[in-house]
A protein has these predicted regions:
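Single conserved hydrophobic/aromatic residue that forms the stacking wall/gate
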Residues: 1-21
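Conserved active-site "lid/cap" helical segment
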Residues: 23-83, 87-95, 99-102, 182-194, ...
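N-terminal extracellular/periplasmic Venus flytrap/periplasmic-binding protein-like
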Residues: 32-34, 44-54, 62, 196-289, ...
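Conserved catalytic cysteine-centered active-site region
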Residues: 74-131, 173-178, 244-271
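Active-site-proximal alpha-helical scaffold in enzymes
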Residues: 108-138, 187-216, 278-285
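Flexible glycine-/small-residue-enriched beta->alpha junction loops
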Residues: 131-185
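Cationic, amphipathic, low-complexity alpha-helical segments enriched
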Residues: 312-316, 331, 336-339, 350, ...
Length: 359
């Protein structure tokens, strides 16, 4: 592993068999997630705070960290309407952490969970904490509808009901159009074709199908108890992946973005999902003190901003910021994973890494 500081531009290499350690290294001690539920699926009646509590508790258990040892909890959550105050605080207390442990909910839309991880690492590097739980939680299925003028009355004419899922999570607040249009904008900007989108999506689905069949995700998934009719069963299999997806099956789907001649379909766009994930972040010294064998070393994180209508290009911006911060390239990695809103983002940001992306 290596770490690089923007100020020093010094690279540190770490061999876990060595007794020598660098004091400013940050590690991931454990990680877990729920299976991902589709809209209206198995998790549709489980609040985001409950999902968050499940993964926080399990992440601590896997790391062998007692709840009272945690300095802070940071959890991302985008759709917070009608969820109650500070969803992260709810999840923290439901997970059994002491009331003295502070918790903060972060919303930078798609990047919320990873922003929590980066902030946790920054706190630890600054000496403000030794152990932080970070992650994200969301239940899009439970997003409520809102009537913004109902409090003082509509008096006359029709009332508008706002879908908080679409309004707060899936609509560009500046241009007032759906995220699917921003995906179309990226395709226009980079000359991406429908065939490329479908090929990328089919490849991603096939990799996921193979990984599920091989049990690659089994260890990271925490079962969630859900009620099915009169029984309580364990939900532990992702609902989003479609087995048997091919370029041919995807090519038959109609555009759903509303744009004439559009390229985005239900098959090459992101799903609407419910789920949660959490990691335990700590200093290397604390990991050594506790006898924890880290899963990974946190190297760097970056946040960027671009023109809202092209915000799905942000993946490239993050990559450039991270490369500046750490002075490394992606050429040395066998695999890359990118968070993106559908294959439009994937095609635009991974053209040079297609064979190693999300594999």
């Amino acid at each position: 592993f290596f770490f690089s500081s923007r100020r020093r531009h010094t690279r540190y290499w770490r061999d876990w068999s060595s007794d020598v350690c660098s004091s400013d290294l940050v590690v991931i001690a454990s990680a877990c997630r729920t299976a991902i539920g589709k809209m209206g699926g198995a998790l549709s009646n489980t609040p985001a705070a409950d999902l968050g509590a499940i993964v926080i508790k399990e992440a601590l258990n896997r790391a062998g960290v007692a709840p009272e040892m945690v300095d802070e909890v940071k959890m991302g959550c985008v759709i917070q309407a009608a969820q109650g105050q500070n969803v992260a605080r709810q999840a923290s207390i439901k997970a059994g952490l002491p009331i003295e442990v502070p918790a903060i909910t972060i919303n930078v839309v798609c990047g919320s969970g990873l922003k929590c991880v980066n902030d946790a690492a920054t706190m630890i590097k600054a000496g403000e904490a030794d152990i932080v739980v970070a992650g994200g939680m969301e239940n899009m299925s439970m997003a409520p509808y809102a009537m913004t003028k109902a409090r003082f009355g509509y008096r006359m004419n029709n009332a508008t009901i706002i879908d908080t899922m679409v309004n707060d999570a899936l609509t560009d607040a500046f241009n007032h159009y759906h995220m699917m249009i921003t995906a179309e904008n990226v395709c226009d900007k980079y000359g991406i074709t429908r065939e490329e989108l479908d090929e990328f999506s089919a490849n991603s689905q096939q990799k996921c199908e193979a990984a599920i069949a091989a049990g690659k995700f089994d260890d990271e998934i925490v079962p969630v108890p859900v009620k099915v009719k009169k029984e309580i069963v364990e939900f532990k299999k992702d609902e989003g992946p479609r087995a048997g997806t091919t370029v041919e099956t995807l090519s038959k789907l109609r555009c759903c973005s509303g744009k004439e001649g559009g390229l985005v379909t239900a098959g090459n766009a992101s799903g609407i999902n419910d789920g949660a994930a959490a990691v335990v972040v700590m200093s290397e010294e604390k990991a050594k003190e506790l006898g924890v064998k880290p899963l990974a070393t946190w190297v760097a994180g970056a946040l960027g901003g671009v023109e809202p209508r092209h915000f799905l290009y942000l993946n490239l911006h993050y990559h450039k910021n991270t490369q500046y911060e750490t002075d490394f390239t992606y050429l040395g990695f066998d695999g890359l994973h990118g968070r993106s809103f559908g294959s439009g983002t994937g095609c635009s940001s991974k053209q040079n890494h297609r064979n190693r992306s999300n594999g």
